[in-house]
Amino acid sequence: MYLDQIKSELVEAQDVLNKFISDENNIKLIQEAALLISNSFKQGGKVLSCGNGGSHCDAMHFAEELTGRYRENRPGYPAIAISDASHLSCVSNDFGYEYVFSRYVEAVGQKGDVLFGLSTSGNSKNILNAIEAAKTKGMKVIAMTGKDGGKMAGLADVEIRVPHFRYADRIQEIHIKVIHILMMLIEFEMAKQA
């Protein structure tokens, strides 16, 4: 009944992944992002992560695996997903949804911390505002984007972009793969310090 559609979806996902892998720069950027986060942790910094919708879930997933665990039993790493419901509703109501992440960065971000922002379009105003706030605070910025990077293109210290122009879900599939690789590399790098 749906066998052809199922296979077609899997083939398209594989094609997007293969295209991403074929650009050697993407591999280098993943390593650069992992080292940037690890160095922040080693110097007492933390990660603040944010996104909208499915990307918000990915931001929470990333923070959870930093504070909890990925594959290895090890100390928790300092990470916060900007997902507190009372903060989000307060700022949305009082200032506007475009400030929900930047207000949090202004409140708890410090020089040497890392903002990890996800936007499949690269155009999310609240992520753009968070990037601006992070830079003002002297933080480093890692952006995970899609398509052509949108307005976020060129704003981050490290941008990992999935150049897919059809649906956001394909971009998110690569984002979660990258998040898992980042976790693995961060655990490797932090184990050197233990």
Curated annotation (Swiss-Prot):
HAMAP family in alphabetical order: GmhA
Instruction: Paste the cofactor note.
Output: Binds 1 zinc ion per subunit.
Alphabetical keyword list: Carbohydrate metabolism, Cytoplasm, Isomerase, Metal-binding, Zinc
What is the protein name given in its UniProt record?
A: Phosphoheptose isomerase
Q: Which family does it belong to?
A: Belongs to the SIS family. GmhA subfamily.
Localization, per the record, is: Cytoplasm
* Pathway the protein contributes to: Carbohydrate biosynthesis; D-glycero-D-manno-heptose 7-phosphate biosynthesis; D-glycero-alpha-D-manno-heptose 7-phosphate and D-glycero-beta-D-manno-heptose 7-phosphate from sedoheptulose 7-phosphate: step 1/1; Bacterial outer membrane biogenesis; LOS core biosynthesis
* Cystine connections: none
